[in-house]
């Protein structure tokens, strides 16, 4: 279980760093409004990642399968963005997907580092 918590902390840290870099880049190259929309989506992605981690943590002890209620978070955010004129759907959605970019970075890093003990396990 300790490895799970370390992985979770690493993924959250990478997500937050990536969010900061992309937020500043979007603010510089586009506008503050679009950057804030991205940040809203990225924060929702971090909350989604946290909910997923709690769900996985309970898996096996209390539950037999993962719940689908986490997707309601994204649906509510997209619905809010479509109703409120100040919010834009695309930057919010791309911000939400930041945690997916974190997962891709982690997998590529683990796959190409041959000294990783995770790769030596059968």
Swiss-Prot record:
<dbReference type="GO" id="GO:0005886">
    <property type="term" value="C:plasma membrane"/>
</dbReference>
<dbReference type="GO" id="GO:1902600">
    <property type="term" value="P:proton transmembrane transport"/>
</dbReference>
<feature type="transmembrane region" description="Helical">
    <location>
        <begin position="11"/>
        <end position="31"/>
    </location>
</feature>
<dbReference type="InterPro" id="IPR056309">
    <property type="entry name" value="CGL160/ATPI_dom"/>
</dbReference>
<feature type="transmembrane region" description="Helical">
    <location>
        <begin position="88"/>
        <end position="108"/>
    </location>
</feature>
<keyword id="KW-0472">Membrane</keyword>
<keyword id="KW-0406">Ion transport</keyword>
<protein>
    <recommendedName>
        <fullName>ATP synthase protein I</fullName>
    </recommendedName>
</protein>
<keyword id="KW-1133">Transmembrane helix</keyword>
<keyword id="KW-0138">CF(0)</keyword>
<comment type="similarity">
    <text>Belongs to the bacterial AtpI family.</text>
</comment>
<keyword id="KW-0813">Transport</keyword>
<comment type="function">
    <text>A possible function for this protein is to guide the assembly of the membrane sector of the ATPase enzyme complex.</text>
</comment>
<dbReference type="Pfam" id="PF24763">
    <property type="entry name" value="CGL160_C"/>
</dbReference>
<keyword id="KW-0812">Transmembrane</keyword>
<dbReference type="GO" id="GO:0045259">
    <property type="term" value="C:proton-transporting ATP synthase complex"/>
</dbReference>
<feature type="transmembrane region" description="Helical">
    <location>
        <begin position="32"/>
        <end position="52"/>
    </location>
</feature>
<keyword id="KW-0375">Hydrogen ion transport</keyword>
<keyword id="KW-1003">Cell membrane</keyword>
């Amino acid at each position: 279980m300790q490895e799970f918590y370390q992985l979770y902390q690493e993924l959250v840290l990478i997500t937050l760093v990536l969010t900061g870099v992309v937020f500043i880049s979007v603010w510089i190259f586009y506008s503050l409004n679009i950057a804030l929309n991205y940040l809203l989506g990225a924060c929702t992605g971090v909350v989604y990642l946290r909910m997923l981690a709690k769900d996985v943590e309970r898996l096996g002890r209390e539950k037999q399968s993962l719940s689908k209620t986490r997707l309601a978070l994204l649906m509510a955010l997209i619905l809010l963005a479509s109703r409120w004129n100040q919010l834009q759907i695309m930057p919010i959605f791309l911000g939400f997907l930041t945690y997916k970019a974190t997962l891709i970075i982690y997998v590529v890093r683990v796959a190409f580092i041959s000294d990783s003990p995770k790769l030596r396990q059968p």
